[in-house]
């Protein structure tokens, strides 16, 4: 027995996903989507979809007249599980302090590490659930969350447990990434800590069986290419797909490493070269660009057009973390357009379909095509262009996750848009 979960109909613009006919997007005017048993069953003109799937027979019927409907956002790079407050560091940066200055004074990542180690599991879960609520309210229906603020076996495992617990109770799908190699903890030599990650943390993470990916901060002054390779190869042997923070602050070869190890994604990439981009394309590694990070630091942005023009499937993420405190994929897409050179259509693809590729999702996630997960966002605007156009504004009006209309503490008006 199948269940007609939802029918969204009458949309001024319904975006099914990237087009295959020369257009950027496959769109429908007066469009509709039907979701059955959590999966998209039909998408197309309202007259055709509703003839087969009558809205009055659905658990949720959404009249989207005057509105646009898009796939739910996929945020493929966050550090959303943390404790403590580093807002004072934002003010310090405005006064001219560099991140390196702040780190030398005991701030930055290591300050968050101390706060996470001091927090109990209940507090960490509460923090993460609150962040997921806000992300959901801004249209994110799938998000990757990394560990990496523990930097010891016990706390890294605790973080992964919390991520798993959040995934079990929250509507947003939460994808877990182990990142013990996020920084070198206080009192450690980098080689010794790399060995601890490889010999102690990775086997413990494998035994726990929660993490899906293994990430490393391959950067000058953090983990070298050789050290990063050790971590990623150990993770791969434990069944964890590699990811790489690469070429953020300097060019040291992290992008080529990502290609060599067959990473799902290489992220940041501010200093990637044309040769690096070609290597990613050849190895089918998705580049993930993080405009919010540059915005928060007042730094240069990656050139998305360089990746696009070489055939790379550019993805965009928030990089939500204590040093980049934005939950909003919409804001990230605005920056990707204004500062990185993407069009609104390209930015939407970067935050949906291509973002799903960065998480190795090939089930249609990030689209509204037949067989894809039933994750859709109804905008309080008639076109997807309003996402980057209304920068700083949350244009999300209603969210469907697996075919169910989801409300959040910050969005309690959905009932006005939904007729059961």
From Swiss-Prot:
Catalyses which reaction(s): 4-imidazolone-5-propanoate + H2O = N-formimidoyl-L-glutamate
The GO terms this record gives for MF are: imidazolonepropionase activity; iron ion binding; zinc ion binding
The UniProt annotation places N-formimidoyl-L-glutamate binding at 149, 321
Which InterPro entries does the protein's record reference? Answer: Amidohydro-rel (IPR006680), HutI (IPR005920), Metal-dep_hydrolase_composite (IPR011059), Metal_Hydrolase (IPR032466), MQNX/HUTI_composite_N (IPR054418)
Per its UniProt entry, what is the enzyme's top EC class, as one word?
hydrolase
Q: Which UniProt keywords apply?
A: Cytoplasm, Histidine metabolism, Hydrolase, Iron, Metal-binding, Zinc
Residue positions binding 4-imidazolone-5-propanoate: 86, 149, 182, 248
Which Pfam family is one of this chain's hits? Amidohydro_1
Sites binding Fe(3+) sit at: 77, 79, 245, 319
Localization per record = Cytoplasm
Q: How is the cofactor bound?
A: Binds 1 zinc or iron ion per subunit.
- Kindly report the protein's main subcellular placement as a broad class: cytoplasm
Its pathway is: Amino-acid degradation; L-histidine degradation into L-glutamate; N-formimidoyl-L-glutamate from L-histidine: step 3/3
Biological process (GO), any one: L-histidine catabolic process to glutamate and formamide
| Gene3D superfamilies the record matches | Metal-dependent hydrolases, Urease, subunit C, domain 1
Q: In the Enzyme Commission scheme, what number(s) does this protein have?
A: 3.5.2.7
Known cofactor(s):
Zn(2+); Fe(3+)
Q: Name one GO cellular component term.
A: cytoplasm
Q: Where does Zn(2+) bind?
A: 77, 79, 245, 319
Q: What does this protein do?
A: Catalyzes the hydrolytic cleavage of the carbon-nitrogen bond in imidazolone-5-propanoate to yield N-formimidoyl-L-glutamate. It is the third step in the universal histidine degradation pathway.
What family name appears in the similarity comment?
Answer: Belongs to the metallo-dependent hydrolases superfamily. HutI family.
Q: What is this protein called?
A: Imidazolonepropionase
Query: What broad taxonomic lineage does this protein's source fall under?
Result: Archaea, Methanobacteriati, Methanobacteriota, Stenosarchaea group, Halobacteria
């Amino acid at each position: 027995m199948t269940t007609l979960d939802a029918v969204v109909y009458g949309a001024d613009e319904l975006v099914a996903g990237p087009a295959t006919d020369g257009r950027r997007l496959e769109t429908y005017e007066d469009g509709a989507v039907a979701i059955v048993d959590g999966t998209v069953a039909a998408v197309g003109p309202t007259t055709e979809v509703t003839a087969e799937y009558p809205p009055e027979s659905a658990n949720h019927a959404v009249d989207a007249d005057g509105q646009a409907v898009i796939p739910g956002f996929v945020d493929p790079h966050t550090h959303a599980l943390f404790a403590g407050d580093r807002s004072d560091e934002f003010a310090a940066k405005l006064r001219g302090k560099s991140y390196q200055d702040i780190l030398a004074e005991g701030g930055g990542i290591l300050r968050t590490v101390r706060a996470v180690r001091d927090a109990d599991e209940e507090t960490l879960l509460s923090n993460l659930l609150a962040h997921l609520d806000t992300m959901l309210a801004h249209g994110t229906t799938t998000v990757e969350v990394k560990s990496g603020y523990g930097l010891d076996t016990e706390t890294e495992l605790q973080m992964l447990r919390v991520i798993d617990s959040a995934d079990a109770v929250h509507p947003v799908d939460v994808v877990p990434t182990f990142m013990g190699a996020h920084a070198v903890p206080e009192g450690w030599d980098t080689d010794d800590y790399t060995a601890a990650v490889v010999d102690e943390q990775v086997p413990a993470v494998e035994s726990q069986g929660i993490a899906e990916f293994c990430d490393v901060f391959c950067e000058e002054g953090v983990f070298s290419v050789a050290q990063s390779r050790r971590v990623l190869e150990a993770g791969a042997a434990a069944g964890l797909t590699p990811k790489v923070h690469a070429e953020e602050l300097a060019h040291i070869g992290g992008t080529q490493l990502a290609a060599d190890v067959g990473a799902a994604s290489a992220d940041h990439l501010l200093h990637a070269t044309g040769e690096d981009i070609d290597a990613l394309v050849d190895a089918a590694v998705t580049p993930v660009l993080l405009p919010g990070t540059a915005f928060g630091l007042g730094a240069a942005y990656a050139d998305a057009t360089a990746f696009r023009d070489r055939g790379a499937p550019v993805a965009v993420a928030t990089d939500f973390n204590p040093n980049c405190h934005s939950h909003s994929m919409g804001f990230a897409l605005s920056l990707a357009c204004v500062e990185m050179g993407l069009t609104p259509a390209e930015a939407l693809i970067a935050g949906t379909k291509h973002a799903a590729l960065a998480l190795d999702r090939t089930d249609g996630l990030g689209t509204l095509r037949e067989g894809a997960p039933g994750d859709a966002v109804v905008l309080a605007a008639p076109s997807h262009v309003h996402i980057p156009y209304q920068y700083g504004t949350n244009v999300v009006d209603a969210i469907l996750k697996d075919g169910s209309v989801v409300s959040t503490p910050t969005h309690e008006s959905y009932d006005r848009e939904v007729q059961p």
